[in-house]
């Protein structure tokens, strides 16, 4: 089996965990939409203090706010490169665990919008997408990605690029319309 350092910064919560052979060794989080940069390093250090060395990194690839995603993905890639281990990307919405047959998960997209996806029996059937909450049918569940679920999904998916569903707020002058 494997030992995974798990990182997700797709929501206002920075999530870091250490999972060995499908057992959570350590997990922690920090709430703060503008503090991912500090939080991910502190949480990763705490995870590594458990004394178990990861042989791969599993990272949530969004959807999520541009800056938050970049922080987590960049940290994951740099950590993996320094240790010469693989990085596996996961759609963060897929890692939100819900005990229902049909449901919609959503996370705050700011600007009064949500990133959302619909699921049936744990399989994504629609999305991810970004809309106003009133434009999304169904009961919306607002939770956070689960560390163990991110690792479980790493056996069946590998998202190579961040899931950005809209342009960032800040763009280079040359790229402005």
Whereabouts are the PLM-identified features?
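A short glycine/serine-rich beta->alpha loop
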Residues: 27-32, 61-65
